[in-house]
């Protein structure tokens, strides 16, 4: 993975934002943008970053604070003022409780903001407070998940990244994850990185650059391991040209759009119509032409970052009858009906 750090860009960023919270916060926002610019690390709204500092209260006291990205904010456009300040000491005390619900935890996060007008901090805020480094970065890196989301995933991670990495099983983000992280750090206080199975990777450092470069280094190791270990070869069972694919798109797109349109009850705009974005690239066509493409396409996504955008599974049409529009329409109807039923079942 490319290390996007640039001394020139960093200096320009500091010059632009130094006046808000100082140089370190400017660099914190700068490296957050570097992470957000890499879609194989995070997508819009995913991941989170933080830095520990202090807030001066009305009595002139400097109170330890954790400054963390607000939930859902985009790392690619972070500025120093986009970080939410939370009472650091209280966060650590919170993790000493035996159990609280996620709803209670979110309430506690909000009641211990230093500015009540600030947006809600990430659900993973207590984790950032526990980790020893001053700066913390968390991503849902594709290369890491490609290793964790398979049989013997932990073994793959340890082989790729080394035994000094803490590896935790999948735990739903929230209070229980924070408790498990606290226990793991207590057992290995020198650890600077942790992989959460089926979730992502979190690293820390004493400066924004150190933490960022640790993230890039570890993800790069995972990428190298994947390339060296790849043995699966998928033979192509057909070869669809771009010309043929475009012709098929012109046939199928109106049928899909018509079936996705929904009545609104508004006589001026009777239908809520959908616009489709075709993904017609040589790589996509080559993938769909390989043996076993159906099983791969109908595998769940790697991460919640992807899930938000793709949903749990796509609608799939077996052997589309492009030369018979009536049959093709029936195939699409059946596929969409099955998709809706499966998705409703997933929600329930």
Give residue ranges: language-model regions:
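Glycine-rich flexible loops
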Residues: 1-348
């Amino acid at each position: 993975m490319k290390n996007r750090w640039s001394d020139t860009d960093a200096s320009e960023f500091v010059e632009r934002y130094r006046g808000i919270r100082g140089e370190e916060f400017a660099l914190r926002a700068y490296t957050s943008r570097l992470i957000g610019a890499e879609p194989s690390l995070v997508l819009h709204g995913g991941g989170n970053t933080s830095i520990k500092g202090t807030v001066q209260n009305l009595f002139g006291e400097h109170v330890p604070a954790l400054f963390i990205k607000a939930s859902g904010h985009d790392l690619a456009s972070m500025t120093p003022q986009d970080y939410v300040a939370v009472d650091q000491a209280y966060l650590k005390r919170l993790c000493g409780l035996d159990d609280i619900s996620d709803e209670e935890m979110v309430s506690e996060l909000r009641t211990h903001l230093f500015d009540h007008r600030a947006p809600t901090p990430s659900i993973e805020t207590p984790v950032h407070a526990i980790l020893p480094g001053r700066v913390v970065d968390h991503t849902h890196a594709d290369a890491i998940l490609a290793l964790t989301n398979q049989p013997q995933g932990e073994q793959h991670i340890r082989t790729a990244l080394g035994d000094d990495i803490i590896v935790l099983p999948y735990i739903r983000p929230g209070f229980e994850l924070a408790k498990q992280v606290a226990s793991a750090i207590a057992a290995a206080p020198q650890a600077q990185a942790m992989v959460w199975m089926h979730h992502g990777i979190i690293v820390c450092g004493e400066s924004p650059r150190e933490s960022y470069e640790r993230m890039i280094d570890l993800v790069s190791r995972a990428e190298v391991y994947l390339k060296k270990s790849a043995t699966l070869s998928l033979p192509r069972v057909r070869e669809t040209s771009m010309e043929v694919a475009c012709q098929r798109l012109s046939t199928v797109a109106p049928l899909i759009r018509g079936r996705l349109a929904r009545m609104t009850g508004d006589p001026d705009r009777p239908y809520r119509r959908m616009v489709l974005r075709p993904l017609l690239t040589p790589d996509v066509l080559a993938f769909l032409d390989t043996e076993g493409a159906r099983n791969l396409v109908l595998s769940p996504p790697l991460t919640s970052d992807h899930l938000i955008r793709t949903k749990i599974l796509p609608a799939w049409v077996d052997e589309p009858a492009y030369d018979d529009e009536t049959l093709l329409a029936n195939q699409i109807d059946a596929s969409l009906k099955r998709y809706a039923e499966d998705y409703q079942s997933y929600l329930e």
